[in-house]
Amino acid sequence: MQGELQFGVAQSDWQYHAYNGTRPDKVKPYDKLRAVFSAHPEPFQIIARKGSKIKDWKSLKGKKVNIGNPGSGQRGTFEVLMEAHGVDTGYFGATSELTSSEQSGALCDKKIDAFGYTVGVPNAGVAQSTDGCGASIINLDTGAVKKLVADNPFYAFATI
């Protein structure tokens, strides 16, 4: 896609990968890329259904988890988190590839136990899950996440 656009919007991790050539699809570095401004932080969150007994990353094991639709920011970040924790989709009881507009309803309807979401705060989809059906944002403060943030300048911790 190099040269096809004059202006675009991207998440900081994908901008970093495009500039440095570190994307998973092995695209060459594009060092003419420039950042104009940062719109707002988009912390990655995992929202767990009330009654699912999910409190942290370890308790996702064996659960029904939406990892995001292919090509989405939440899917990309979820894959990075799985790799950092040394697991793949087999770690979960089942995975789904719902879009961000589908996942809150699926959580409240008990079709999934949790979903990951890379989004600015506040967000209506997260509010639908937390206010509408008692879901909660789980703690992602693990050693693997601490190392991931320390090793990657485009990630930062956020408190919600």
Locations of the language-model features?
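N-terminal secretory/targeting leader peptides
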Residues: 1-4, 82, 110, 133
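Short, glycine-/small- and polar/acidic-enriched structural segments
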Residues: 1-61, 66-69
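Phenylalanine-focused residue identity feature
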Residues: 7, 19, 37, 44, ...
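Pocket-lining segment of extracytoplasmic ligand-binding domains
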Residues: 12-14, 22-23, 89-160
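Bilobed "Venus flytrap"/periplasmic-binding protein-like clamshell domains
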Residues: 38-109
